Amino acid sequence: MELKASEFGVVLSVDALKLSRQSPLGVGIGGGGGGGGGGSCGGQGGGCGGCSNGCSGGNGGSGGSGSHI
């Protein structure tokens, strides 16, 4: 069960990165997960509360919270 949960989390992160590249809305949702997309995230920081934090730190963990929202 734990292994599946870990794999599921990784898939969500990858999916969020793909969405962020395909549509601008995806950047706001999972912007924290993609350090490279941090610049775009800053423009739409208002859409996501923890987005600005994720952009500065560039941590993958923040991306999980963003995708959940």
Curated annotation (Swiss-Prot):
Transmembrane segments: none annotated. There is a cross-link at G39-S40, G61-S62, G64-S65 (Oxazole-4-carboxylic acid (Gly-Ser)). There is a cross-link at C55-S56 (Oxazole-4-carboxylic acid (Cys-Ser)). GO terms for biological process: defense response to bacterium; killing of cells of another organism; negative regulation of DNA replication. The keyword Oxidoreductase does not apply. The processed N-terminus does not resemble a typical secretion signal sequence. Keywords: Antibiotic, Antimicrobial, Bacteriocin, DNA replication inhibitor, Plasmid, Thioether bond. There is a cross-link at S40-C41 (Thiazole-4-carboxylic acid (Ser-Cys)). The keyword Nucleotide-binding does not apply. There is a cross-link at G47-C48, G50-C51, G54-C55 (Thiazole-4-carboxylic acid (Gly-Cys)). Residues 1-26 form a propeptide. This glycine-rich peptide antibiotic inhibits DNA replication in many enteric bacteria, that leads to induction of the SOS repair system, massive DNA degradation and cell death. B17 inhibits type II topoisomerase by trapping an enzyme - DNA cleavable complex. This is Bacteriocin microcin B17. It comes from Escherichia coli. The gene is mcbA.
